[in-house]
Amino acid sequence: MAWSAQQYLKFEDERTRPARDLLAQVPLERVLNGYDLGCGPGNSTELLTDRYGVNVITGIDSDDDMLEKAADRLPNTNFGKADLATWKPAQKADLLYANAVFQWVPDHLAVLSQLMDQLESGGVLAVQMPDNLQEPTHIAMHETADGGPWKDAFSGGGLRRKPLPPPSDYFNALSPKSSRVDVWHTVYNHPMKDADSIVEWVKGTGLRPYLAAAGEENREAFLADYTRRIAAAYPPMADGRLLLRFPRLFVVAVKK
């Protein structure tokens, strides 16, 4: 499934804030060989190049549109296409940084453990993932998928992202190879204009596979049903806006 950089960047500031918060906890003053894994359109890569330099960071993604936008944004930075489930750097890295990508990678705990082997001693693995499958945005996706004439397209259940493991699983997986592991949650509260704005947000990520599965002929009806559910799930605040609650999980591990 292809992604849309343009749709993703409609909420660039909000999407980049967790990337900044993740980078703020990376205890490296200098990086000689760093990677932005799942770099998307380059908004997170730009944070890394601003801090460490354009020549020491490489962006990695699996989507052509995202890589094209990233290269346009940062023409002096290297980008490459790869599947993160099997990717390895050509040589050991100082920094493996991943903002909002490993929630899509099957068995990502094992992948993260393997990536620790690709770090120099003192190198850092820094990961952030949405932990929002129990939020109304995602519950409504499942309800909409199961409730319309398109439901047969979802009968296999393969689109439903698996919940993230508990924090203790990340400690258990990474601690044997780390001198330090930090795991924490942050809940972001984003004021949104209306239900349509929330739908536009999730159209850039979580809702996209559902729309693709429903088919072009059902797209507008699926969106209308989903938007109705979102409007019912998010009551307006005093000023009429809706508050989008968005939990995220952060992991920072320093290699022994």
UniProtKB/Swiss-Prot annotation:
Name of the protein described by the UniProt record: Trans-aconitate 2-methyltransferase
Family: Belongs to the methyltransferase superfamily. Tam family.
NCBIfam families according to UniProt: PRK01683.1
HAMAP family to which the protein is assigned, alphabetical: Tran_acon_Me_trans
Highest taxon above the source species: Bacteria
Keywords: Cytoplasm, Methyltransferase, S-adenosyl-L-methionine, Transferase
Pfam families hit by this protein: Methyltransf_23
Cellular component, GO annotation: cytoplasm
Function according to Swiss-Prot or TrEMBL: Catalyzes the S-adenosylmethionine monomethyl esterification of trans-aconitate.
Gene: tam
Single GO MF annotation: trans-aconitate 2-methyltransferase activity
EC supergroup of this enzyme: transferase
GO biological process: methylation
Catalytic activity: trans-aconitate + S-adenosyl-L-methionine = (E)-3-(methoxycarbonyl)pent-2-enedioate + S-adenosyl-L-homocysteine
EC annotation from Swiss-Prot or TrEMBL: 2.1.1.144
Location relative to the cell: Cytoplasm
